[in-house]
């Protein structure tokens, strides 16, 4: 199951799992036309897998529960859940440069509802099937904003929660041989975002595929509950962006990742009495809206 599959990292993940890994992927989103085009792309790729498109509003708990019941009834097991649905980018982009008290409350809700809460609900409903099978992997798609101020209060709070969601779920799932991890891509090149040298949706999809198909039990046991980085997974499991074969882009991304890893390796600023507060204008100013040019084309 891949949520948020109409665009961005969710769409790329669904496509790679079906076309390159041969999975039967239940791809969920609210936009039927986008799901149908994804289904067509996968069918035309001549891969061994398939995409089952499911129009689903993740704010509707009963609809989500009914969807999981249908999948559980028709499939022997659910091997993988990727929680990628997130409405925060669309919600926050028109308000760059404003502090949280000048932004609509709906900006916070965009990150928390179709983001953290949606991931929690879907995971809670899928977990029983995985526990019964004594096997399964849950992946949350998150961001460096989980451990440093980036863009918006809601953005940071939501991604910190996503990181913690995997850790605490893994703690309770470990005795059942079910794993939960968080995946941190860097900035992306998607329908919404335009980060320079950003990661493509298919690159992130290959990171998920590596965890599901290439990682052995020893690695997954150690990774359980942890936050993993796409560029490091690319080096470990030998995948790359389309057209990049010499490893130079992966290496550049690993090097660019280091400052963020340094932050995450230290005691987080909120737990360090002597740590200075960041300057919000470093990442929350009107110029940053240019990194999200596609946000205006979608509704929250």
Q: Which stretches of residues belong to each language-model region?
A:
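C-terminal helical subdomain
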Residues: 182, 195-298
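Conserved glycine-rich Rossmann-like NAD(P)H-binding loop of the short-chain dehydrogenase/reductase
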Residues: 20-37
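Rossmann-fold cofactor-recognition segment
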Residues: 42-61
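A short, exposed helix-loop element centered on a Lys and neighboring polar residues
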Residues: 123-124, 167
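Catalytic loop of short-chain dehydrogenase/reductase
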Residues: 87-88, 99-107, 137-175, 186-189, ...
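Conserved glycine-rich cofactor-binding loop
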Residues: 6-8
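Active-site Tyr-X3-Lys motif and surrounding loop/helix of classical short-chain dehydrogenase/reductase
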Residues: 66-70, 92-102, 106-113
